[in-house]
Amino acid sequence: MAANPSGQGFQNKNRVAILAELQEKRKLLMQNQSSTNHPGASIALARSPLNKDFRDHAEQQHIAAQQKAALQHAHAHSSGYFITQDSAFGNLILPVLPRLEAE
């Protein structure tokens, strides 16, 4: 089979773009690390918890939306009953199973 030269060119351009982006991020991280020795670093450090809180809140909203969608899908396509609860295994919803007494 002959290789597609234009496909390889696209892959190479994509790789170059990814590498350039990674180098830029690395450069910014290095600058942030070097700025911790300067008095202005406290401003940058003070912002990071706010960004983390914002990301955590956004992630929680995304998970809540996923849980709601999974719960609605399960109720629509199953005769069982499900609840939303955090799971050690990353499940968004858990089935509720009734306990039957032994006869």
UniProtKB/Swiss-Prot annotation:
- InterPro entries on file: SOSSC
Q: Which residues form a coiled coil?
A: none
Which one Pfam family would you cite for this protein? Answer: SOSSC
Q: Which UniProt keywords apply?
A: DNA damage, DNA repair, Nucleus
What top-level branch of life does the organism fall under?
Answer: Eukaryota
- Where found, per UniProt? Nucleus
For this record, the Gene Ontology CC terms, alphabetical, are: nucleoplasm; nucleus; SOSS complex
GO biological process: one example:
DNA damage response
- Function statement: Component of the SOSS complex, a multiprotein complex that functions downstream of the MRN complex to promote DNA repair and G2/M checkpoint. The SOSS complex associates with single-stranded DNA at DNA lesions and influences diverse endpoints in the cellular DNA damage response including cell-cycle checkpoint activation, recombinational repair and maintenance of genomic stability. Required for efficient homologous recombination-dependent repair of double-strand breaks (DSBs).
How this chain assembles, per its entry, is:
Belongs to the multiprotein complex Integrator. Component of the SOSS complex, composed of SOSS-B (SOSS-B1/NABP2 or SOSS-B2/NABP1), SOSS-A/INTS3 and SOSS-C/INIP.
Its family? Belongs to the SOSS-C family.
Give the protein name, as stated in the record. Answer: SOSS complex subunit C
